[in-house]
Amino acid sequence: MPVEAPRPARHLEVERKFDVIESTVSPSFEGIAAVVRVEQSPTQQLDAVYFDTPSHDLARNQITLRRRTGGADAGWHLKLPAGPDKRTEMRAPLSASGDAVPAELLDVVLAIVRDQPVQPVARISTHRESQILYGAGGDALAEFCNDDVTAWSAGAFHAAGAADNGPAEQQWREWELELVTTDGTADTKLLDRLANRLLDAGAAPAGHGSKLARVLGATSPGELPNGPQPPADPVHRAVSEQVEQLLLWDRAVRADAYDAVHQMRVTTRKIRSLLTDSQESFGLKESAWVIDELRELANVLGVARDAEVLGDRYQRELDALAPELVRGRVRERLVDGARRRYQTGLRRSLIALRSQRYFRLLDALDALVSERAHATSGEESAPVTIDAAYRRVRKAAKAAKTAGDQAGDHHRDEALHLIRKRAKRLRYTAAATGADNVSQEAKVIQTLLGDHQDSVVSREHLIQQAIAANTAGEDTFTYGLLYQQEADLAERCREQLEAALRKLDKAVRKARD
């Protein structure tokens, strides 16, 4: 997989599907104020081959990947969930490679398929009659499709060990109602009005989220027979939810979405914190490989994250200064330089996200969340509580107070950073175990000291850039101005810490009552 995989264009699809019987008459859209004209489109014959892993990992994540011929949009289509009635569609053209999935589409879902084979799992043939609904301005508003569907499931769908008796043919009729979106927005009220006409005509909301889901036997979007159930244990459930978020942010990072690297790193650290504070429950040891791998992944993502945060920070601070206070090449060095470092960090991150090492980490996380809470000596593990995590926060706070009284700035900053890391672990554990007030107060401390740590990193970077600017004979006035602003911010954060710690203590004592 190339480091710089091309990014396919994205299109927001807003549609609803309806089940109808053979005798149901197509609806009329007369009387709907927004619709001034309905135009019949030529009949289409669409043939699509759907691809997935042998265990249907894409379908379980409500994702479809197909190669379609016929119609105006022949090509490869990848559809991702984007909310109720919405999916993000990405396309690639047909090529001479036949059934080889385009690399740019496969890369989008690489965290789901990993190094498994992606192969045909179904073929769907659709005879489509469609109508385009136009508004007063002459623009298309929506498309109504009357589909007669014939489908065949591939032998890969059969359960492990089951005999393969060949593909089974299925036939049904369905309606689709798709809005024409503009700049990623859609008139959902219009969709409701149009959908009511279909219901009045005798249609029923589809019992499947896609044609493929019906072929594979799903009863609702993303649900396949014998799919995993959410863990009952709250900490296991929290880890499971964060692993799902990790896969979502993985796709956002590959698309270079704003703040995606930062959020993926946050999610990685959440998982690591929850596992570290619940090792007995998960059957892990202190030096567990999965915890070490999560730390390493966060470190790799941190290069791009730090550059993105610093670049945004300097952009805001420089924009807030009077023009006469911004001297020399400070914007080029601080903002443009951060953007270059971000691109370097992003390339490193993408290399990591396409590696076997990353795939094995994801496999290990899947195994952890799918297993029952680890039991010791035939008994259930002790429930995870906030007590141990809070004791670590108090210990770090005491050490920081000592460092503030006796040590220099560096040791003080390190001690405050330790409070932040431990408050973060407490926050995640408290949220997972239902101690919401504790989680909120821990978040306040995490945010406060996060701002402090960003100030520490920023001041170190400002010194380095000021030295380079001075060596080049440039004006360094603005670097000193920004440095003092950062120092003032750090001082304000330290002044607010004691009160925040008291509020946390109060929340913990209340949670214990």
Swiss-Prot record:
Pfam families noted in UniProt: CHAD, CYTH
PROSITE patterns: CHAD, CYTH
Domain CYTH: start-end pairs: 11-219
Domain (CHAD): residue spans on this chain: 228-506
Stored InterPro entries: CHAD_dom, CHAD_dom_sf, CYTH-like_dom_sf, CYTH_domain
Protein name, as recorded: Uncharacterized protein MT2285
Organism of derivation: Mycobacterium tuberculosis (strain CDC 1551 / Oshkosh)
